[in-house]
Amino acid sequence: MSDLEIGIAETHVRDLHDSPKLDPSCNGHSWSSKGAWTPCCYTPDHAQAKCMWDKPAELTQLKATGFEITIGQPGETSGVVLDSQKAIAAWQGSPLHNDVILNRGTWEKMTWRSMGAGIIDSHACAWFSDQPDPAP
């Protein structure tokens, strides 16, 4: 686990939980304008993928591309309280998310060298990078 990636995940999960509800086209990779980061509406067509990829370098000393899997929509609460086991089970039940975790499909040439996760109520984020955390 990477302290820097955990920090990114905790920051984003807090933003997802606390932000106002965004446009319905904005998914869980979106960032509100309520923090010290570049906001974006991440849409299903991945047109704003750079917003996600650049967050590690924007928020930390980890000058690397980041990849994220999420549960929950900005500003919405499902009523389900997640823990690590429920979040992992949900991601494993989604072929696209499970592929990220297991480096399959699109991700088979990546080797995750750092990762971190955060959970608040019905929101969860896990971040991955092919670069190691530079912190000792």
Segments (PLM) and residue ranges:
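Functional surface patches built around histidine and acidic residues
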Residues: 1-136
